[in-house]
């Protein structure tokens, strides 16, 4: 078994892995975890869905990046997000988009069911789209979940505040191994 670290949509992949094979997961570290698509993100998805075949996908990606990471101190994360998007083709973007549009039932299940696996959420205090849902889940999943919120930090915590993120994750894993 191993410790798994996932950022943003990667947290969904780790949680699914833990659902399917809990014996393989020693702990889960979720950075910028997505546990619920809030009202803004739902609107964002609907707008994107309307324009995904009309607008160049890079325009939509830039819009998403700015909405999810709007502040000046999120610029590095925004640029990383956009530069990675440039490596995708329109077809791949549409597949990614369909995946995110269909994720709600899975996220609801994750919020309702607590796994008996230590779970450490590391979130940015400025992650207005996803932090509220994580706070709620941690308050309900008290047996296995804990949360650390990084000040002056947005959604992509491992980029915005890499040093703090790494320090806290290593501390958590060390505690799990003792």
Over which residues does each language-model region extend?
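Short alpha-helix in the alpha/beta-hydrolase fold that links the catalytic acid
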Residues: 117, 131-139
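Short beta-strand/loop motif that positions the catalytic acidic residue
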Residues: 115, 121-123
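Alpha/beta-hydrolase fold nucleophile elbow
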Residues: 1-8
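Acidic catalytic loop of the alpha/beta-hydrolase fold
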Residues: 125-130
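Catalytic active-site module of serine/aspartate enzymes centered on a nucleophile-bearing elbow/loop
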Residues: 144-178
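Conserved alpha/beta-hydrolase catalytic His-Asp/Glu region
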Residues: 39-41, 58-113
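Flexible "cap/lid" loop of the alpha/beta hydrolase fold
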Residues: 15, 19-20, 25-55
């Amino acid at each position: 078994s191993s410790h798994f670290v996932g950022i943003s949509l990667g947290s969904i992949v780790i949680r699914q892995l833990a659902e399917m094979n809990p014996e393989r997961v020693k702990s889960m570290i979720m950075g910028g975890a997505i546990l619920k698509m809030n009202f803004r993100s739902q609107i964002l998805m609907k707008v994107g869905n309307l324009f995904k075949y009309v607008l160049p996908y890079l325009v939509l990606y830039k819009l998403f990046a700015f909405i999810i990471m709007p502040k000046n101190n999120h610029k590095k994360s925004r640029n990383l997000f956009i530069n990675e998007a440039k490596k995708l083709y329109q077809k791949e973007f549409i597949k990614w988009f369909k995946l995110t549009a269909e994720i709600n039932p899975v996220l609801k299940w994750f919020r309702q069911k607590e796994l008996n696996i230590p779970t450490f959420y590391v979130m940015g205090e400025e992650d207005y789209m996803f932090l509220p849902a994580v706070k709620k889940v941690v308050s309900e999943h008290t047996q296995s979940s804990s949360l650390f919120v990084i000040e002056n930090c947005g959604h992509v915590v491992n980029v915005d505040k890499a040093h703090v993120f790494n320090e806290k994750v290593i501390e958590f894993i060390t505690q799990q191994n003792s």
